[in-house]
Every structure is written in C-alpha cells, then in structure tokens.
C-alpha cells in the first residue's frame, strides 16, 4: 500500500510539473497587445487583420515589440510593423523602420532599411538584412554588416551572428577588423563582447604601417591592446622576413 501511495504521489507531482511547463509554454507562445491608441478588426482582400495604431507595445517571449502602426494577420499569425520599430529584450535593443514578425517561428525579420542592434555595452551592429529569434535570443545577419564597439573600433563581414545569451558576435566571410594601429583581414572571427576578446582563425593577415603578418589562428585583447598570432606565423617588414610558431604583438 505504501509503495502504491508513493507511486501515486510521484505520478501526481509529475502531472503537475508537466501542467506548469505546458502553461508556461502556452503563455510564452501568446502575443499580447499591451497598449495602443486604437485597435480594430479589418478585412483586407478576404483576410482578417487587427489594425493597431500606436504608439503600440506588444509582448511575446518576454520581449517587447514597439511600433507606430501594425497589421496583425490573425490567420497566418504574422505581424507587419512599421514606424519607430524597436525590439527590447533584456540588454539587447534592435531598432529599424519596419519589421515582419512571424509569431509561430518566434522570428523578427528586418529587410531593406537599416537595422541597428545594440548590447548593454553599446557595441552596435548595423545591417540591412537580419533575423532575430526572440526565443533563442539569436540574431543572424547576411549581405553585409558592420559592428562598432564602444570605443569606436570596427569589425565588418558578409555574414554573421550575435548570441545575446553569451554576448558573442561571430563574423564570417570577408572579415575586416580595424583597430587603432592594426588592420586585420580573415575568414572568421569571434568577438566576446563581455571579455573584449576577438579570436580569429585560418587565413588571417594583419598590417601595421609597412609591416605585414599572417597566421592561421590567434586573438586580440582589446582592453590590453595585445595581439597573439600562432600556427604558421609569417612576418614581413620593409627590410626583414621571418617565420615562427607564435608571436605576441603589443
């Protein structure tokens, strides 16, 4: 009897935890219109929309969507927002003129106009093509983008990502990094914004005045202004040339 009671209690506890999780999932999946000047149902070519005139404030996945005007397609669960558009999620802020929000995919799509992503340290990424997943807190940009850190140094590339949960920018394809004294070109670079640390990989080339250096990996400590290059390091100056396994540059 005691074993049966224990099993029953365990089963009920399991059901309760599943129920709480399901309720949380259901709450997170709902989009809530928190405020606006007006909201009304309209019919556009046979489709039902909620037309929202703002300033409007929506909430989804603990993320705020702000805009001047929005059309919310009830059937496809897509929100078209324009005018002073902002996405606010904890320490990450995205701003643009317009966006398309796919509710079932937790995805904010920015196309055409400039979109700006800024973290708590005022590292600022700008591009014209960006997707932001409000559930995973992950931004993906394509077709070119540039990030300026809080001190004005710039990293640019064809594509990349930003994971706000771990404060990590990733840049891929035709990556250029501009520092106060050194210019770096590489194929892939990761920038940990909370550590002020850039890590680069294969095919890295760096220039400082008339000096050139290449390697297949290394890092740059922004706070201490220190470069470290390793793996097939090749150095050329106007009068010398050398090879080594690793090299520090101050």
Predicted regions and their residues:
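Bacterial N-terminal signal peptides that target proteins for export
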Residues: 1-9
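Bacterial N-terminal signal peptides
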Residues: 8-17
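Long alpha-helical, hydrophobic tracts
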Residues: 2-3, 18-22
């Amino acid at each position: 009897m005691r074993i049966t009671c224990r099993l029953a209690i365990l089963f009920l506890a399991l059901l309760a935890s599943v129920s709480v999780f399901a309720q949380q999932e259901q709450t997170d999946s709902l989009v809530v219109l928190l405020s606006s000047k007006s909201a009304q149902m309209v019919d556009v070519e046979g489709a039902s929309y909620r037309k929202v005139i703002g300033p409007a404030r929506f909430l989804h996945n603990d993320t705020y969507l702000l805009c001047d005007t929005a059309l919310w397609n009830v059937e496809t669960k897509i929100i078209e927002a324009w005018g002073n558009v902002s996405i606010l999620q904890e320490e990450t802020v995205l701003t643009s003129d317009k966006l398309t929000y796919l509710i079932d995919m937790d995805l904010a799509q920015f196309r055409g106009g400039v979109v700006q992503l800024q973290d708590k340290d005022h590292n600022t990424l700008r591009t014209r093509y960006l997707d932001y997943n409000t559930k995973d807190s992950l931004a993906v940009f394509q077709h070119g983008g540039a990030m300026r850190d809080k001190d004005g140094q710039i990293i640019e590339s064809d594509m990349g990502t930003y994971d706000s949960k771990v404060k990590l920018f990733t840049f891929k394809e035709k990556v250029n990094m501009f520092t106060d004294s050194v210019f770096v070109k590489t194929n892939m670079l990761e920038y940990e914004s909370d550590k002020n640390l850039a890590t680069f990989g294969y095919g890295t080339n760096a220039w400082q005045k008339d000096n050139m250096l290449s390697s297949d990996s290394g890092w740059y400590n922004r706070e201490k202004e220190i470069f470290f290059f390793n793996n097939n390091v090749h150095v050329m100056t106007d009068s010398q040339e050398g090879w080594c396994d690793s090299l520090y540059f101050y």
